[in-house]
Each structure stands twice: as structure tokens, then as C-alpha cells.
Amino acid sequence: SFQSARAAYLRGTKNSLYEGGIRMPFLIKYPKKIKAGQVNNESVLCAVDLYPSLCAIAGIETEKGYQGDGQNYDKVLLGKSKAKRKTDLMWDFGRNQFFKKPGNANDRSPHLAIRSGNWKLLINSDGSDAQLYDIEKDKFEKNDVAQSHPEVVAKLSKKVCKWFEENKD
């Protein structure tokens, strides 16, 4: 169906923290700087990385005192390299009585997620519904490996729940 095809057959839709709701293509055109037709499906970037990366490409300094979460991936955007993230990515998709959940129950994710290296943990802030995926091996999020990696679940849930508590206002 169109519903599943629009997210490249990944699990999830908008309003979900599964890959189908958060993974997006990014196109960039910069004639004479970037060779046309290049594709990079390996590097993991986030919107917060755009400001420091585009400033570096433009040859300008970030705003004085800037302490954002983004990393400079100018070489990745220019097609000169591929990069592994050095820091974790975290998401909170707030839930309340007004929130519209995805219609398909399989697309309804917990409201917190953290991506750390190849691991992606989804969990609710009360510790319920922990799901762990090795995104490099399972980008469709079909094989929850939380039971076989309790140490990873404990480490990542502590990080993302702490982040949520510090940033929920």
C-alpha cells in the first residue's frame, strides 16, 4: 500500500519514533562544490547538525557562545567523506490526550528514543515498553533484542530518561 511505501517500507509513520517516522532523505545541491549524483546512505546526521555544518561550508563562524547539540559534518555534506556519529541522538515525541497516534498499532512507538552507534532504544519515560534494535542489521525494526542485551537497555534507558527529565519543560 501507499502507506508503507511512503516510508521506504520502514516500520513507523509520522507521529512515531520508528525509522519510518524519523529517517528522512536529505538532498543538497552546491554546483562546483558537490559532484552530482552522489549518494551516502551510511552517515547519520540530524537537523541540529545543519547549522554548524553549513556555517563551516560557508566559511563563517557559528554565533558567539553557540553551544548547540549539532556536530560539524561539512565534509559529509560536500561528499568528501562518510562519518559515524560521535554523540547520541535522542527524541521525545510527546504524548497527551490531544496527541494523534498512528492508526496501525505496529507503528505506535514508545515516546522516547535514543540512537547510540548501531543501537536504537525506544522506551517510555516510566521505563515501560523498552525495545532495542541493531539499526545497522535491522533497519526495519523487526527483531527486538532487548531481552538479550539488558546491559545496553539499562545504559541507554538511563541516558534517555535523564535527558527527558532535564528537557521536558
Please give the residue ranges for each predicted region:
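Short glycine- and hydrophobic/aromatic-rich loop-to-beta-strand nucleating segment
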Residues: 26-28
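C-terminal cap/loop subdomain of S1 sulfatases and analogous C-terminal strand-loop tails that border
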Residues: 1-17, 34-43, 48-135, 166-167
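Ligand-binding/active-site lining segments
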Residues: 20
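Active-site-proximal N-terminal segment of extracellular/periplasmic enzymes that hydrolyze or transfer
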Residues: 143-151
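Charge-dense polyanion-binding interfaces
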Residues: 155-169
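Intrinsically disordered, low-complexity polar regions and short flexible loop motifs
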Residues: 138
